[in-house]
Amino acid sequence: MNISLIGILTSLAMGGTLPDDSKTQQQVAQVSTHILPNIAGQWQLRLDKTDAAQPSCQERYNFGRDQQFIGSSGQEFTYGKYLYADTGDGLPALAIQTQYDNNATDCSGNRVDQTGDILVAYVKQQGEQMQWCKDSKGTRCDMTLQRVLP
């Protein structure tokens, strides 16, 4: 059935009704969208080298769009879930829960199993740099990370 706008208006003007489309099948396209948090991607912690004789050590965090994170520090490998949310007062908060830790030595020389641990930080982000702060005002920021990959 081919229906035009003029045909519908003419039919209505003469006291007619609209055709019953209940028998007509319609296909509706479904579109999925994902909103990525600002921190999605891979970040590297800036580490100060305390001993020139020691090889350089890298600590990296990868935040996925599915609220999964993967971390590595020296020989240590971890993964888990994260939540990044606006607090309404001050900086956004980042909560990371470690679900697995291989309990290997990290860049600071420590060997601690962090499985089950939850880290909470407030995030101050400027361009390709992110700082993890202890307070929502961003006055006590101990860790600075640089974006490696989007």
What does each model-found stretch correspond to?
Residues 1-8:
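Sec-dependent signal peptide recognition
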Residues 3, 60, 110-112, 136, ...:
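General secretory precursor processing signal
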Residues 8-26:
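Bacterial Sec-dependent signal peptides at the C-terminal "C-region" and cleavage site
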Residues 27-44:
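N-terminal helix-cap/turn-to-beta initiation motif at the start of protein domains
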Residues 39-40, 60-69, 87-88, 122-129, ...:
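Short, solvent-exposed coil/turn segments at beta-strand boundaries
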Residues 48-55, 70-128, 134-136:
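Contiguous, well-ordered beta-strand patches that form the walls/edges
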Residues 141-149:
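Short, low-complexity, Pro/Ser/Thr/Gly-rich segments in the mature regions of secreted, periplasmic
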